């Protein structure tokens, strides 16, 4: 679905409950994760540092396959590499300073049609906008791309060892 994020569409009702729970919840949407692309330059570095049959070579092969698949799916959107959706979300959970956020009441569409949007789409909650006590979600607006990519590629290289 073009309007629902993969992790949300798997269980929109659960995601909506999390958004309304009052928990300290960051949301890193596609508009932000698409700012953090892993390109073939990074995988080339992994290959240079790897033993010919090492873990880094294996990880570079997997990443290059994903980069190629994304490029095949949409050459314009993925010309610079593949988005690191889940790695960025995990990194933000560990280090919220990677992103700048705006606190907003959010909801997840759980139905489609009849004045509903598309199931799984995340939107600002109009009811929460008029209720100052409504739970807020930390919606990421920007990311420190350079810091994240540098840290991510370094950590992968360190974990790979070889």
Regions found by a protein language model. Name each.
Residues 1-20:
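Active-site glycine-rich loop that binds ribose-phosphate moieties when present
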Residues 9, 25-162:
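Conformational coupling and interaction surfaces
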């Amino acid at each position: 679905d073009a309007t629902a994020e993969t992790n949300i569409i798997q269980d929109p009702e659960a995601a909506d409950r999390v958004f309304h729970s009052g928990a300290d919840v960051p949301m890193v949407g596609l508009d932000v994760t698409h700012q953090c692309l892993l390109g073939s330059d990074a995988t080339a570095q992994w290959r240079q540092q790897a033993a010919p049959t090492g873990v880094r070579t294996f990880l570079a092969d997997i990443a290059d396959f994903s980069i190629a698949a994304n490029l095949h799916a949409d050459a314009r959107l993925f010309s610079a590499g593949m988005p690191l959706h889940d790695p960025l979300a995990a990194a933000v959970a560990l280090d919220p300073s990677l992103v700048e956020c705006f606190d907003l009441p959010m909801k997840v569409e759980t139905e489609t049609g009849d004045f509903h949007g598309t199931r799984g789409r995340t939107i600002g909650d109009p009811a929460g906008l008029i209720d100052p006590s409504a739970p807020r979600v930390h919606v990421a607006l920007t990311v420190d791309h350079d810091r994240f990519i540098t840290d991510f590629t370094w950590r992968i290289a360190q974990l790979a060892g070889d």
